[in-house]
Curated annotation (Swiss-Prot):
One of the primary rRNA binding proteins, it binds directly to 16S rRNA where it helps nucleate assembly of the platform of the 30S subunit by binding and bridging several RNA helices of the 16S rRNA. Forms an intersubunit bridge (bridge B4) with the 23S rRNA of the 50S subunit in the ribosome. One of its GO terms (cellular component) is cytosolic small ribosomal subunit. The keyword Ribosomal protein applies. This is Small ribosomal subunit protein uS15. It comes from Acidobacterium capsulatum (strain ATCC 51196 / DSM 11244 / BCRC 80197 / JCM 7670 / NBRC 15755 / NCIMB 13165 / 161). Coiled coil: none annotated.
């Protein structure tokens, strides 16, 4: 679970305007942070299969948001993947 302070930092870094909290860029950044936290969790709790299912759902949702962003706003897509280091 993301701490509210960390979530606010992510939103301020990726938002497109002052009151932006739900744009694809922000959602992708928040999901990426949650995915990173779960990945660290699995280094010590390898047999936590219910959380692994949640991780796969988060990865799938992030993938769909990235596909949407790539289709509708290629410049933002490149910017987001560059900042997060998700893909080539």
């Amino acid at each position: 679970m993301l701490a509210p302070v960390k979530k606010t930092e992510i939103i301020s870094q990726f938002r497109t305007h002052d009151s932006d909290t739900g744009s694809p860029q922000v959602q992708i950044a928040i999901l990426s942070e949650r995915i990173g936290e779960l990945t660290e969790h699995f280094k010590t709790h390898a047999k936590d299969h219910s959380s692994r299912r949640g991780l796969l759902k988060l990865v799938s949702k992030r993938r769909r948001l990235l596909d949407y962003l790539k289709l509708h706003d290629t410049d933002s897509y490149r910017d987001v993947i560059g900042k997060l280091g998700i893909r080539k």
